[in-house]
Every structure is written in C-alpha cells, then in structure tokens.
C-alpha cells in the first residue's frame, strides 16, 4: 500500500502526474525514485524530484521538447536530463548500471535493461524504492520500506560505503 503522505506529495505537485502520463502514454516506463520517495513516505516536503526510465536521453529530449517542455542535458555521461516546468525542475535518468574497479571510486556507467538493475546501484535501501505514479505502486526490491519503518540505514550493495571516502 502506498502511504497517504507520498500521495499527498504527488497531489501537491500535479505536474509530476502530467510528465508521468506523457512517458507512459508513449510506451516508456517511468518511476519516481530516491529521496523524493523516501521523503514523501516520511511526510517530509521536497522539491527534489528524480525519475528513472527506460527512455534514452535522446528519447526524453525529443518527447519533452515536442510537447513544449524545455530540457537541458546536465549529465550526458550519467544519462541525465533536466526538465523545467515553470519554476520547477525534474531530473530524468535512463536506467543504468554502475560498476567499480577494485581500487576506483568512479563508476563505469552503462545502460541497464530494467528498473531493478537501476535501483541496485543506489547507495541505501531507503533510496532504492521506486514509485509508479500511473500504477500507484511502490517497487521495493531491497526492503527499503522495512528499513524506513525500523529507522535502519542499510547499504544496497557492498561498495556503497566506499564511494564517500
């Protein structure tokens, strides 16, 4: 069940539904991820919205620009674009997989085929929860909801703790 607090956050930011519907109606997957999902569940207001999708950056730019939206490439190497809607901005990133050499803190980045692979690259389980606005459904393969409920912070993967050294 999706917490009412997350639904309230989405309701206060109607443009998120509009963008989600645009992607879904054009055959793409589209999920709210990261801190916005976590904060929405915890009833913390945020304006920092990140989405992940199977659309490439080129697909996103074409889709959004052809529908009158302004976009900026802010992280080509990460597959990330920024969408500006009025005074709001949203980051949209193509599903990706990060891999690390044993001695490196800098990931090798490649496209990923699915949402779960994308979620597995995130640092903590509480940041690895995705929300489908269209389906009104949470995706939580790493049990981040359980960690939120217990006040626990757990790494999604072994290397996460090494990236901030």
Indicate residue ranges for each PLM-predicted region.
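Catalytic cores of the polymerase beta-like nucleotidyltransferase superfamily
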Residues: 1-162
């Amino acid at each position: 069940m999706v917490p009412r607090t997350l639904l309230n956050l989405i309701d206060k930011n109607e443009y998120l539904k509009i963008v989600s519907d645009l992607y879904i109606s054009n055959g793409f997957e589209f999920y709210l991820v990261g801190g916005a999902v976590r904060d929405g569940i915890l009833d913390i207001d945020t304006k920092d919205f990140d989405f992940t999708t199977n659309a490439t950056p080129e697909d996103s730019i074409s889709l959004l620009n052809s529908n009158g939206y302004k976009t900026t490439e802010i992280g080509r190497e990460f597959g990330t674009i920024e969408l500006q809607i009025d005074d709001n901005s949203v980051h949209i990133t193509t599903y990706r997989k990060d891999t690390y050499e044993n001695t490196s803190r800098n990931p090798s980045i490649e496209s990923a085929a699915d949402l779960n692979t994308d979620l597995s690259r995130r640092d903590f389980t509480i940041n690895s929860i995705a929300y489908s606005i269209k389906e009104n459904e949470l995706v939580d393969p790493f049990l981040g909801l359980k960690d939120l409920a217990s006040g626990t912070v757990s790494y999604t993967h072994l290397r996460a703790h090494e990236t901030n050294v």
